[in-house]
């Protein structure tokens, strides 16, 4: 059984940064041969690691610390006016958690989302193998939040259950329903689910000040950032 003291880590060679142009990044990975159970996964997440399929990673850049792990203190969260509007707008959705697994209807929504929203990114073109390796493989206590409208799947959020919270992995939605703000709605739903389970945190991954697509994370308050090995409430001024 692996534990933090026995884990082996590997660093990648420098590669193009996925978030900031004209920068190089280095990524630290946990040895993929290690057995990661829920307890160890929770400990790694609290240390700033994220899961992508069966891989656990953290930025390890020599000259840049722009990627900041953040988590929401769900017990102190109160939705603002815009977030309350999103909740009202999506009150007609049927939402349920199901075990993370491959299905064609999940993949169709995923592929549609990637093709319409991320054609210029490294996830294009989508494939069934990509979906499975990213969202299904390596799952420890992993779930999909189904969001359906009149029986049709319109949103899917991958979420992991940890010892001290939930970890929001990835969300896709029908691009033609962008006006519903389903990404925001998925986070709000996960906040309420963490509260229901009496878990203190929702881990939101990395916040990058200079990356516009990461800015949404600071709309959820109070948010904590992991800096210098300690979680502290983050000022967004």
Curated annotation (Swiss-Prot):
Q: What are the EC numbers?
A: 2.3.2.29
Task: Report which reactions are catalysed by this protein.
Answer: N-terminal L-glutamyl-[protein] + L-leucyl-tRNA(Leu) = N-terminal L-leucyl-L-glutamyl-[protein] + tRNA(Leu) + H(+); N-terminal L-aspartyl-[protein] + L-leucyl-tRNA(Leu) = N-terminal L-leucyl-L-aspartyl-[protein] + tRNA(Leu) + H(+)
Q: Does the keyword Transcription regulation apply?
A: no
Q: Does the keyword Metal-binding apply?
A: no
A Pfam family found in this protein is: ATE_N
Q: Where in the cell is it found?
A: Cytoplasm
Name the major location. Answer: cytoplasm
Please list the GO biological process terms of this entry: ubiquitin-dependent protein catabolic process via the N-end rule pathway
InterPro entries from the xrefs?
Answer: Acyl_CoA_acyltransferase, Asp_Glu_LeuTrfase, N-end_Aminoacyl_Trfase, N-end_Aminoacyl_Trfase_C, N-end_Aminoacyl_Trfase_N
- Write down the top EC class of this protein: transferase
Q: Name one GO cellular component term.
A: cytoplasm
Which domain of life does the UniProt lineage start with? Bacteria
This entry's Gene Ontology molecular function terms read: arginyl-tRNA--protein transferase activity; leucyl-tRNA--protein transferase activity
Keywords attached to this Swiss-Prot or TrEMBL record, sorted alphabetically, are: Acyltransferase, Cytoplasm, Transferase
Family that this chain belongs to: Belongs to the R-transferase family. Bpt subfamily.
Functional note: Functions in the N-end rule pathway of protein degradation where it conjugates Leu from its aminoacyl-tRNA to the N-termini of proteins containing an N-terminal aspartate or glutamate.
NCBIfam families (UniProt xref): PRK01305.1-1, PRK01305.1-3, PRK01305.2-2, PRK01305.2-3
Name this polypeptide is given: Aspartate/glutamate leucyltransferase
């Amino acid at each position: 059984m692996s534990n933090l003291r026995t884990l082996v880590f590997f660093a990648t060679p420098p590669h193009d940064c996925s978030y900031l142009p004209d920068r190089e990044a280095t990524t630290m990975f946990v040895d993929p041969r290690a057995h990661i159970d829920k307890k160890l996964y929770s400990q790694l997440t609290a240390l700033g690691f994220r899961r992508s399929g069966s891989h656990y990673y953290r930025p390890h850049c020599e000259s840049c610390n722009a990627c900041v792990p953040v988590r929401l203190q769900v017990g102190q969260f109160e939705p603002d006016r815009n977030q309350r509007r999103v909740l009202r707008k999506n009150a007609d959705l049927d939402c349920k958690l199901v075990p993370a697994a491959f299905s064609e209807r999940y993949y169709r929504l995923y592929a549609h989302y990637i093709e319409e929203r991320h054609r210029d990114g490294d996830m294009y073109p989508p494939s069934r193998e990509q979906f499975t390796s990213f969202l299904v493989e390596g799952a420890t206590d992993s779930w999909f939040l189904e969001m359906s409208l009149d029986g049709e799947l319109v949103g899917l959020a991958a979420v992991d259950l940890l010892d001290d919270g939930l970890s929001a992995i990835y969300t896709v939605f029908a691009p033609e329903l962008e006006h519903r703000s389903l990404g925001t709605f998925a986070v709000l739903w996960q906040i309420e689910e963490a509260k229901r389970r009496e878990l203190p945190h929702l881990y939101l991954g990395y916040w990058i000040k200079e990356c516009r697509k990461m800015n949404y994370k600071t709309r959820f308050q109070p948010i904590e950032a992991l800096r210098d090995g300690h979680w502290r409430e983050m000022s967004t001024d």
